Amino acid sequence: MNDRTRKDRQYYRTAFFLNLAAGIFSFAWTISDQRGLFSLAGDFDVQQIPFAMYANDAIKSGNVIWDWSLDLGSNFIGGMSFYILGNPSFWVSLLFPSRYFMFIVGWLYVLKYAFAGLTSFAWIRRHVSDESSAVVASLMYAFSGYMAEDLLFYHFHDVVALFPLLLLGFDLLMQEGKKGPFLFAVLFNAIVNYYFLVGDVIFLAAYYVLRYFVPEGKKSLKGLFQGLFEAVLGCMLGLWLLLPSFFFVIQNPRVKMDYHGSNSLVFGAERYLYILKGLLFPGEVMSDQSAVIAHNFASCSAYIPMVGLVLVIAWLELMKGRKHWMKRMLLFCLVTACVPILNAAFSLFAGLYHRWYYMPTLLFALCGAMVLERKDREDQIRTRRAEHAANAAELRLRRDAEDRGEEIPEETLRSARREKSREVLLETLPSERAVRKGAVIWGCIALAFIFFLLFVKWSDSEPSKIYHIEEFTVWSCVCLLGILLTWLFLVRLRSRWKTVFVLSLYFFAIFTMGAAVFLYQTAHAEDARHHYDRLLTSGQISCLKDEYRVNSNENPETLTHGFMASGNFCSTVSGSIFRFYEALGLKRDVRSPDPPEGLAELVSARYTFEEEAREEGEPVQTVEGTWHSYYVYEDPSVAPIGFTYDTYMTYSDFLDTNKDNRAILMLKTLVIPDEKEEVVSRVLRRYSAKEDGSANKEHLSRISASHLEEAAEDVSRTTDSYSCTIRAASDSYAFFSIPNDSGWKASVNGEEQEILDICGFMAVPVSAGENRIVFTYTVPGLAAGILGTLAGALITAVYLVLSRKMKKREAQALPADEGLTGSEADSPARARR
């Protein structure tokens, strides 16, 4: 190992452990306070924790095909791939039993910050000669406002940590012809979260055009084609996860384009003000913000601890009149952030999100590293000049004294040296002038923003855009103090400025991240110990049968343990579930809708969990914990999943009925597609309220109990099947409240049957007598995805082997005295040149 390699590793270790320590300081206080546990708020407590715990158990038990507990049922891979299946931190958590997740998740957060710092350092160091400046910049990236605001979304942080590897791998390919790093960077970024892959592709395309194609033109096309080939290979290696996820997610109505007309070109004034706040203020609690917009989940924060955009403006000032790819990239980011349709492109035009802001944050950190390097270099030159000036002044005095035949006192010499040295040291460097200008500009913008919100009336209906004056005051002070300290340390301070600057930046990073954790916890979170007790206690419930659901929309009590429920929420679920709620006239977007009368009976939700005993009725099971107790009650009138109908009505007629009674009506009669009426009418008769009775709340219990006569028996439910026996008095249709995903196939008494879509659920024809009904499920795209991955692995292996052989031949063909030593050849400075 040469000195260069040893020094490089030292800086990598420094970057990792510096960010690791900052993460520990940010999280350790709350982990310690909660006896080793960690919880946060909202989505984190009721989604991220249950998802991780349930998926842990599901993977270890092999239940990874159909997820019965994800809402009303969904494809496990499709449902969980957006959140955790490709998430490195989740795979680390699999080393522990699921019940320990709340003990390790806080430390997993810390590791994410450490790795975000490490990967950002790896990319930034290629653009500066001073690795210590790159280390400082890694802290800016890892502890940006984006990382603080998005604490709620646990799975976002892995994306941020892996993103710099994408740029690093691409640079290695374009600049040095290194094959492989970009390929695997694409793989990791693709499987960690397919949603962010879209933004990665757009940003990388802009990066190629603005960094390589603009200055180099056609010369860069060879590298581009190599990059495209490696990108395809990287995606092929991830097809085992990407292809099933693609087939799954295209069913989701949240994946749609909703930009048109003038709103695609210009945001409203409020949104521009909100974007500016995300640059000025540290990341806030999404659901309870201090100003501009009270609650917003768009991830609109790109704050850099302490410095804000001061160093970005300073870098632009230093580069005035010079061409540089970073200028083009910053302009691209600015225009994209300000134009709605361009901003929306990063999420495939699906909603108003700003979840790509971690990308410009990396550029901001690089600007900071470049300014610090420039300042450090100029400061060293100034220090040497001051020393030379002091020596020259002393020499002149000594010569003058010798000419006069006098002896000069040492104090006079020291005074002259100090005066001359001070004169040089007080000179303002170009980098200091740039930082001063950046501080003035950014400070004026900050003051204008603060005073505007404090003193300007927004509208008659909403006079003030400040919702929490205390938090607004704190963040205003943090913003202005950071600008002031940046100016003070980088412009006014002449000695040990870098040490003081880094320590201050470190404090700001820890404070802003720790404050975000604190505010999230105080705004919404249940005490971690209480939440953990809730999880453990509900996990003791053991009386539930496979053919029934729980009437609940509480993820921690049901989804965590794989209990089927009527309202477990997840954003990524089978598209059939959306069709079901749409048929009921309900909207399902960021939460499961409140269940209407009859929904529990329709979906076979027989059980109810209560935390206090009812005055009437005996629970079928009682479990007690330290802070929580659960009483499990059942409704004997609820039929299991799988029961028959003797009447039908068409979907178009169903939509003409009262929305409030639609769930009861679905329980009363089979709601069929209009085009299937001719087939179904041969078996069932058309529903008539006059002859068959009305479907309303008063008749609900009787309607539900009527299905018990011909309901599922001998039920078997596995990860890829649902089977039961139904004894029918006559030919009819059996209904199953299982989402009609495209992967389902059905057979009755061994003969395959067409599945009838019932408002997103399933029904099959049954004959008079005993019917053995078997539903089997295969994940759409999984088999093809696995084959694609195997093919990609084979091509990748051949590609890398051939690349290595070609590299060896090229090395052997080079003259022995090519002019570079090994350490020089490996130096990142060579790539920078």
Regions found by a protein language model. Name each.
Residues 22-117, 139-160, 249-254, 262-304:
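Membrane-interface coil-to-helix junctions
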Residues 1-32, 226, 488-492, 496-504, ...:
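Start-transfer (signal-anchor) and selected internal transmembrane alpha helices
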Residues 95, 468-471, 499-732, 737-744, ...:
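Soluble catalytic regions of membrane-associated enzymes that act on cell-envelope
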Residues 177, 196, 328-388, 394, ...:
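Contiguous transmembrane helix-bundle modules in multi-pass membrane proteins
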Residues 217-225, 312-334:
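Membrane-interface helix-loop-helix junctions at transmembrane boundaries of multi-pass membrane enzymes
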